[in-house]
Amino acid sequence: MHSSPELLLEARGIRKSYHKDKIELPILRGIDVGFVTGEMSALVGRSGSGKSTLMHLLATLDQPDSGEVWFDGTRIDNQSRARRDQYRNSQIGIIFQFYHLLPELSAIENVLAPAMIRRSVLGYLRDRKSLRLRAEAMLDRVGLLTRSHHQPSEMSGGEMQRVAIARSLMSNPKLLLADEPTGNLDTETGATILSLLRELNREDELTIVMITHDDSIAETADRCYRMCDGLLEDNASNLAGGDRSDSAKLETVAA
């Protein structure tokens, strides 16, 4: 008898609405989904399907109207803001489509920036040497150590995304959330970023949840979930085993 896979991250009955001019706009309408430890999963859907809103809830950047978010066996959506921030800062790395690098800082300074912000001046001065060594190691991990003193204006889009990935790894997170990580890149550069994410997943055993509108990108994941109009349409497509030429095709299951 096979045991169920261990879930690192889970959404249970998640609902979320926003209000405009006294009109309620439902964005998520009851999402149940789990992400397996050590796997690379994809949430795929068109713009407006609710996938980015779900990612914000999974990252504790926002709270659901109802439902629960569980991380590594602990419910986190109902924690205090300070506690949610602590979870996110220590356990969850996040990258976005547009990198969000500070233009006046070098690559290594951008990687160090979150660690600087989270510490007092004295705390940063105390930990400065070890933090810099960690930042250098993360830039080396993404193949950009030789560009550590270049500013974003001196880097390509792919290089800037690599810096963003290095920054997300500074806290040695268990989970990486990637919101359209190749959406601002050409096809060839996007493929190199996907290859890097897969390498981090397989070699470093980093659990990754990737948000995308592109089926071809979603098909590189171990499991794919399709969202439409705030609902999860698909059963997970397990792409880890079997013939990928067949299994890598997303099946649309009627909601």
From Swiss-Prot:
ABC transporter domain residues: 9-254
PROSITE patterns per the UniProt record, alphabetical: ABC_TRANSPORTER_1, ABC_TRANSPORTER_2, LOLD
Keyword Membrane: yes
Binding site for ATP: G45, R46, S47, G48, S49, G50, K51, S52
Keywords assigned by UniProt, alphabetized: ATP-binding, Cell inner membrane, Cell membrane, Membrane, Nucleotide-binding, Translocase, Transport
GO CC annotation: plasma membrane
Keyword Amino-acid biosynthesis recorded: no
Family matches, as InterPro entries: AAA+_ATPase, ABC_transporter-like_ATP-bd, ABC_transporter-like_CS, ABC_transpr_LolD-like, MacB-like_ATP-bd, P-loop_NTPase
Record-listed E.C. numbers: 7.6.2.-
One GO term of the biological process aspect: transmembrane transport
Topological relation to the membrane, as annotated: Peripheral membrane protein
The organism's place on the tree of life at top rank: Bacteria
Cellular compartments annotated: Cell inner membrane
GO MF assignments: ATP binding; ATP hydrolysis activity; transmembrane transporter activity
Family: Belongs to the ABC transporter superfamily. Lipoprotein translocase (TC 3.A.1.125) family.
Assembly information from the UniProt record: The complex is composed of two ATP-binding proteins (LolD) and two transmembrane proteins (LolC and LolE).
Role: Part of the ABC transporter complex LolCDE involved in the translocation of mature outer membrane-directed lipoproteins, from the inner membrane to the periplasmic chaperone, LolA. Responsible for the formation of the LolA-lipoprotein complex in an ATP-dependent manner.
PANTHER family assigned to the protein according to its UniProt record, in alphabetical order: IMPORT ATP-BINDING PROTEIN (PTHR24220), LIPOPROTEIN-RELEASING SYSTEM ATP-BINDING PROTEIN LOLD (PTHR24220:SF689)
Protein name (database record): Lipoprotein-releasing system ATP-binding protein LolD 2
Gene: lolD2
